[in-house]
Structures are given as structure tokens and as C-alpha cells.
Amino acid sequence: MLLQKTLGLKEDAYLVEGSFEGLEMNLRTLDYLDKLSMLPAGSIDSALTIVDKGGSAIGAAFKNKLDGGDFWFVIPYPAAKASRQQAEKLVNAVLGGGIVSSVRKKKVDPGQFRKALREYLAVSLAEQALCECDKGREPKSFAFNEGRNERLRVLMQRLAKENGFNLKEMSALEICCGNGMSTAAIKPLFKDILCIDNDRCAICNGVYHGTLDPESAMVVDAMALTRFVGEKYDAVLGLMLGTIYEFNKNIWRMIFEEAVKTLKDDGFLLFTVNTKEEMDFLAAALEEMGIRGAVIDNRNKNDIYDGWAFFAVRSNGRFSH
């Protein structure tokens, strides 16, 4: 696992929390640290303070003794300032209280550390270690559609060529990725791609069938995207969004607003939907946000996927097509 490799550990490593939301809320972590603080001196053999290249603390890890084999609990600090300060204060109290016999620093690349966290949570989910779901696995055919894949690749490559983009040099963010059917088509085109969806079962199936790479998949709510994704991307994609109904239009507006915040200048948006009615709403909602783009009739008689596309380029803070 990347988590062990990144931290240079020989023993197994586990997260105290079981989701990205859990990593931000930090409730299990605070309980764990509270229990550690009550241990007598020298109870913990060793610990790590995890720091970035500049020396700032981004997490900690504690070694746990067990007859069947020692293991580590890893604690990444939350992004929110108050939560991070609370966790760091409790960690420092444990480290400075004589409870840990040996403490050393481990310098890591923050991007690699985040990738390791994603892989850990995605693999654990696919192995059904993080839920008690009794649903059967979706068949592999649910995650693959070569006809759709080819049409998506053609559309993406055509738009890139017409607008002077080199996809192989671009990092992409795909929102609402589902089980990764569309991801399988486009990930070979980009330098790298991060995929998010709030459906645990969809991410689980995508990782299990290989349409989603575990180190590049996250179960997070797109309405709170910037809470969990701090980076900006060269391309932001939402492929076969929906279904968009009257009652959930406000939710989609929030998703669009969050998605746009993660796009770099000189990057592009590409959203696809099934119906003209959905596209009319999408284009109008984005125009209300000051985003004007091209609406593309991409219908195909063979299936319902990606019938309408919206494409916009961001340049000097403004959108055009």
C-alpha cells in the first residue's frame, strides 16, 4: 500500500477514520488521542510526526504493539484550521508527555501523501472493510461501454484540438464519476485525473472492476467539493450528469458553483447530459454564473449517453467558447 511506502513503514498501517468526511470531522481520531493521553509513560514504542517539505506538520502516526504483529495508526491533520489545531494539540500532548519512547520526523510529499490516503480508503472500500453493505457486485458490463468510450474520446480530442489544448499535459478533475464508465474512456488522454462521487457503492464497484484507480478516486459530496479538494485543475469534467429534475436543480447549481472554483485559468469545462431539457437548465445556470460556453448536439442513435455537451474555456478569469 502507498501509505506504508510513503511513510517508510515495515508494519501494516491503518487510518483511524474511515472516510474523507471522517478525516475532516476527526471524531474517532480525537477519541483515540484522548485514550492515548491516559496511558502510562513509555506505553507506546514509537511515533512519527509527518511533515511536508517545508517542515510543517501534516499528520502523525503511532505504533501499536500486538501479539499477532505490530501496526501503525496514521492521523492526517484536517484541512480546516480549527480542527487541525485541535488534533495537533492533542498529538503534541501525547508526544510530549513521556507516553512515547521514540519520536522521529518523516518528511513526505503532500501530494503523494494525499494519493496514499485516497488509495487506502478506496481499496478498503472495495474490500468491504469500511461498510456492512449487503449489495451484490454489479456485473463488469455495467462499468464498460466501448461504444460510448470511443465517442467520448473523439469528442474530447476534437474539442482539445480545436482549442489548442494538449490533454497529455493536463490534470483533470471528474465530478460525479459514478462507477468510472466514462473515466475508463478519458483517463488515458490526460496526464492524470482525480474522480469524485458521493455514491460509495459506485466508487466501490469502479475500483473493484478497475475503471477507477484507487489512488485517484474519492467518495465526497460534489456540493462540498472545495472542502475536500484544495487543488485546481486544468480541466473539470462532468460526464452524463443527472438526472436533473425540478426538485434537485438547486443541488446541481451548488455542484456547478463548486466545480468552477476548482478550475485553473486557461483551463476548460466539459459537462454532458442526456436530454435537451437538462442541457437548457445547465447552460442557463452556468450563464447566471457568468459562464458562457458552446452547447453541442452530441446525440447518437445507439444509446442515451452524453447526448448534449457544454464546453467553455477559462481565460484571464473569463469564460468563452
Task: Please place each PLM-identified region on the residue numbering.
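Conserved SAM-binding loop of SAM-dependent methyltransferases across substrates and taxa
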Residues: 179-190
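A short acidic, Gly/Pro-enriched loop at the edge of an enzyme's catalytic core
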Residues: 227-237
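Conserved SAM-binding strand-loop segment of SAM-dependent methyltransferases
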Residues: 212-224
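Conserved alpha-helix/loop element of class I SAM-dependent methyltransferases that forms part
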Residues: 143-168
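N-terminal accessory regions of S-adenosyl-L-methionine
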Residues: 1-148
